[in-house]
Amino acid sequence: MGRAHEVRAASMAKTAAKKSAANGRASKEIYMAAKAGGSDPSSNLALRALIDKAKSNQIPKEVIDRAIKRATGGDAENYVSNRYEGMGPGNTAIIVDALTSNVNRAAANIREVFNKNHGNPEGKVAFMFEEVSMFAFKGKTEEEVLEQLMMSEVDVNDVEVEEDMIIVTAPYKSFNAVKHSLDELGIEEYLMSEIKLIPIDDYIEVSDAELKQQLQTLLDKLDELEDVQNVYHNATI
């Protein structure tokens, strides 16, 4: 299976609860990056990447600006990142990344969602995923992108063309180098520009209608939690 579904999943229409959660997680990420490296995206590459990611996820400009203003205004709020693993309906593997000011609250809420929605928060599944840099955009040919990346001598795993999109996958450590090379090529708008987890093996096809609905509900409930930043899984639903 290609990577176009990764981009589609990230850009799907969200419920009001999901939109609120998405705004909150973008705000926290941008706040932490600006607080650590300064408010200028031209010199703070981590902040620039998160702003690009927020824009591709249709986060309102005022949310981005407010997070940066908080970081530069002496706000002392701090967040801790944690990763949680579990199993979902259909023997699917799920990883949840949280960024929270209250670790106990985050852990309890994530565990509760698993337990109440046919999941198991005790599963160990991290070994089933790998961390990669992923970029998706339109407006360039595969040949143009390959030539640019080769000229830049950056480490890339794959370049695919799917549904009029160019999708570039690279080692997570190559994110800044690949992003810089693509920017030089003239890419101004990214459908995806982030470091994420993807399954090492093929995605699991969940064909049973009841299991599929149970899994979708579990993923939706996790995604709506205030402290959850990302939810990764190895299922096609």
Curated annotation (Swiss-Prot):
Extent of Low complexity compositional bias: 9-20
One GO cellular component term noted in the UniProt record for this chain: cytosol
Subcellular location: Cytoplasm
Family: Belongs to the TACO1 family.
UniProt region (Disordered), positions on chain: 1-20
Species of origin: Mesoplasma florum (strain ATCC 33453 / NBRC 100688 / NCTC 11704 / L1)
Swiss-Prot/TrEMBL GO biological process terms: regulation of DNA-templated transcription
Pfam families (alphabetical): TACO1_YebC_N, Transcrip_reg
SUPFAM superfamilies from the UniProt entry: YebC-like
Name of the protein in its database record: Probable transcriptional regulatory protein Mfl546
Disulfide bond sites: none
Entry superkingdom: Bacteria
Primary localization class, coarse: cytoplasm
GO MF term set: DNA binding
InterPro entries, sorted: Integrase-like_N (IPR017856), TACO1_YebC-like_2nd/3rd_dom (IPR048300), TACO1_YebC_N (IPR049083), Transcrip_reg_TACO1-like (IPR002876), Transcrip_reg_TACO1-like_dom3 (IPR026564), YebC-like (IPR029072)
Keyword set, alphabetical order: Cytoplasm, DNA-binding, Transcription, Transcription regulation
